[in-house]
């Protein structure tokens, strides 16, 4: 059986988490239309009759402006240390940008096969597609170049088939009933954070995180208390909304997803706390599990 690790790498907001969710046919990694949604390394396990592939979804590589940004970059870079193959994902609709070039220069340092994955192919015509393929060929000798649409599941199965060619014959790495490395509390916090980002759109930047403070697993109901952390009072007011209307809406949308995940009723209580400059404070980054690659 073919098995191995595959890292999904790219600048922020090119569809890395969407691709992972498409491959696994589940909403494992949260997505939004804002750059930098993914903050932790998420492993999703794909298995079929002749392969087991561990896909590693990474934070988008970017030029950092704070301590959190530095940590996210280090997390993304670290994934190439123990993988068999790198998928370099780009947004073909946006063309070749400085962010893509920044990532590519880092990838050139790796002695690993790299498949260039051109995402959002459904949004460009064939002439632009061919033009960009030629430009990327001039930039680097990629092992393969693959156009896909992760959102529409276009050509993704063919990509999986190609990935298998680069994996060793080592048998299963994990038991068949495993599909991810993330904890339940992490999944809960990410679902809540996704709803914050989607409901508030451009009003709220990525200065938001979420922590599960209490969880009681009853037979017929899951009881969850979670805290949404922001760095400014003005952001808190947006998330809470008039008469707590926005916070109630965020909680309702999160509860729908969580009830589907747990398969039972969920009681979700949300709070919002202001911690100024939390992205620069080691104490809070450690509490949020975001400091493990700082040193």
Where on the chain are the PLM-derived regions?
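Signal for well-folded cores of large energy- and translation-related assemblies
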Residues: 24, 28, 43, 47, ...
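Active-site glycine-centered loops adjacent to acidic/histidine catalytic or metal-binding residues
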Residues: 57, 119, 149
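P-loop NTP-binding site
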Residues: 184-295
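Conserved C-terminal guanine-recognition region of P-loop GTPase G domains, centered on the G4
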Residues: 47-52, 74-145, 216-221
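Conserved glycine(s) of the Walker
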Residues: 15, 155, 246
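Canonical P-loop GTPase G-domain recognition
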Residues: 5, 113, 122-184
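Catalytic P-loop NTPase motifs of RecA-like helicase/translocase cores
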Residues: 38, 62-63, 95-96, 124-125, ...
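Conserved G1/Walker A P-loop phosphate-binding module
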Residues: 1-81, 90, 229
